[in-house]
A protein has these predicted regions:
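Short, charged/polar "capping" segments at the starts of alpha-helices
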Residues: 50-54, 77
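Rossmann-like dinucleotide-binding domain that binds NAD(P)(H)
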Residues: 96-170
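Short beta-strand elements of ligand-binding domains
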Residues: 43-48, 66-70
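A general structural signal for well-ordered alpha-helical segments in protein cores
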Residues: 78, 114-115, 210-217
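NAD(P)-dinucleotide binding in Rossmann-like oxidoreductases
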Residues: 149-214
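Rossmann-fold dehydrogenase core element
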Residues: 55-74, 84-97
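C-terminal helix-rich "cap/oligomerization" subdomain common to oxidoreductases
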Residues: 2-43, 56-60, 64-65, 214-246
Length: 246
């Protein structure tokens, strides 16, 4: 594994403090085993939806961390978007998430990640249900903590520059987050609308992947224990209990 990272990280053959595992099926078992073997933390790249109960328990018992490296949710601009949403001085009226994916196999994963992002930026998602589903599109509705309605739409097709969008509307303004494909060098963009006009927040030229590894440094230096698994599990449980993805 190679990356442009601070010098405090280096690749070693054995007994690594941090291990990276693929998020393909079975990743929770692989990550759990890495922690049991003494790793202080695990980075999971592109995790698929799986139960995380055992892994969360192991991480707590070992005082270890698990960081999920995801295509959209790991983008550092989500922090800016969350702060912008929290500064809105009126109740939120509506939240809209839309995303384009390249294949049918990506649809359910995009729904799962969208729920995580809504949770992180706006608030916990509830009452989620499928309104419409065809072979290449899915539309869901729900609400967030506080009662504001939420829609999530995922479509299979070409993404023009930025495949993921989150829009939060309130009587006093709005926040728009657009996240590029992780394979590009473009930054995510956060735009804030108010009575004074439109403001684009300063760009953060850091990829989701690099941001994930920067969080590894923070976990060591400050003892951070990220909420990744909690948010991931909350999305999984919500989709299992309240929305039929078949």
């Amino acid at each position: 594994m190679a990356a442009s990272l601070p010098a405090t990280l280096e690749l070693v053959a054995d007994n690594a403090d941090v291990r990276a595992v693929s998020g393909a099926a079975g990743w929770t078992d692989r990550a759990n085993q890495a922690l049991l073997e003494g790793a202080l933390g695990v980075v999971v790249v592109a995790p698929e939806a799986e139960p995380t109960d055992e892994l969360r328990n192991t991480a707590a018992e070992q005082n270890a961390f698990v960081i999920l490296d995801q295509r959209w949710r790991s983008n550092p601009a989500l922090t800016d978007a969350r702060e912008a949403v929290s500064s809105i001085d009126a109740p939120i009226s509506f939240i809209e998430i839309s995303a384009n994916v390249s294949s049918l196999q990506d649809v359910d994963g995009a729904v799962h990640e969208s729920v995580q992002i809504a949770h992180r930026v706006v608030g916990a998602v509830q009452d989620l249900r499928v309104l419409h589903r065809q072979s290449r599109t899915v539309l869901l509705s729900g609400s967030v903590a506080g009662g504001a309605p939420l829609t999530i739409s995922i479509a299979v097709g070409p993404a023009i520059e930025r495949p993921f969008h989150l829009r939060v509307f309130a009587p006093s303004g709005a926040v728009h987050l657009s996240v590029p494909d992780p394979g590009t060098a473009a930054p995510a963009i956060v735009t804030v609308l108010s009575a004074d006009g439109s403001t684009t927040l300063p760009n953060n030229w850091e990829s989701a992947h690099r941001a994930s590894w920067r969080r590894v440094i923070a976990a060591f230096q400050r003892g951070d224990r990220p909420e990744d698994l909690h948010e991931f599990n909350a999305a999984s449980q919500l989709l299992l209990s309240q929305a039929s993805m078949s």
